[in-house]
């Protein structure tokens, strides 16, 4: 996602791999705080799926962090931090986790995020993910006693829960209950409805060619500064387009001419380290 963290990431990447000479001068960056802008991004491989539970593909993971959100994120030091959660308590010698959702969480379809959505999402994810299978073996119950409370009761302590729920690959993303319950964990979701800072523009999606996202106007960032996948993610462009350009030389030329703004994998011979 293009947020304040992404801006810092961009600067770090510039130091490592800016195009030299006139090429660097031609690099078209999205304006921060200026007129309405579109960021055009070229991923390293085609975006074939939008279900981060179904696949561990890097492109799916990356777009997933724009569309979806997690109960826990990770800061830049890889420490898990509450993300969709207002807070949590661990009781009964580590065998009872009570997690409280933040208020004002909304899905892109206009429905409020409720604890039962998160319970259904976690149950689908646990059937697909190896770490989730470990959690199933230790679990007594996973319930939603009210709209904002997720209750996990365990047979024995599992202190690594925040680390597990904040991981990147086959991430435990939150989706509406109807989608989580209605989708086999071993099949792809047919809808890409999350609660993240960007909403997916399904009518513009062309598999293997083009995808687009726009800011979600009901997304409420956390108060903390953004730090990797945790903290307050604030959108800084008005539209993001993923443009698939399989040929590396063609992609490099598109960057030089200003047709695109960002290559995930620039050609090494065009980079200066």
Segments predicted by a language model, with ranges:
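N-terminal secretory signal peptides
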Residues: 1-13, 24-26
């Amino acid at each position: 996602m293009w947020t304040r963290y992404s801006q810092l990431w961009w600067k770090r990447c510039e130091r490592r791999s800016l195009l030299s000479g006139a090429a660097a001068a031609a690099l078209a960056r999205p304006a921060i705080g200026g007129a309405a802008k579109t960021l055009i991004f070229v991923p390293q491989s085609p975006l074939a799926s939008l279900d981060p539970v179904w696949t561990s593909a890097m492109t799916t993971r990356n777009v997933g962090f724009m569309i979806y959100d997690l109960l826990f994120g990770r800061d830049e030091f890889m420490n898990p931090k509450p993300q969709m959660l207002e807070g949590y308590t661990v009781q009964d010698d580590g065998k009872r986790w009570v997690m409280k959702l933040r208020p004002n969480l909304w899905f892109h379809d206009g429905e409020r995020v409720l604890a039962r959505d998160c319970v259904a999402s976690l149950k689908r994810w646990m059937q697909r993910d190896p770490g989730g299978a470990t959690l199933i073996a230790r679990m007594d119950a996973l319930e939603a006693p009210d709209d904002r409370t997720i209750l996990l009761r365990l047979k024995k302590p599992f202190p690594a829960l925040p680390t597990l729920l904040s991981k990147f690959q086959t991430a435990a993303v939150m989706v509406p209950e109807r989608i989580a319950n209605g989708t086999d964990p071993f099949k792809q979701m047919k809808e890409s409805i999350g609660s993240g800072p960007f909403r997916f523009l399904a009518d513009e999606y062309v598999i293997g060619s083009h995808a687009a996202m726009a800011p979600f106007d009901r997304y409420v960032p956390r108060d903390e500064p953004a730090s990797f996948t945790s903290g307050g993610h604030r959108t800084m462009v008005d539209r993001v387009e993923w443009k698939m350009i399989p040929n590396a030389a063609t992609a490099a030329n598109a960057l030089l001419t200003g047709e695109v703004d960002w290559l995930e994998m620039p050609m090494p011979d065009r980079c200066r380290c």
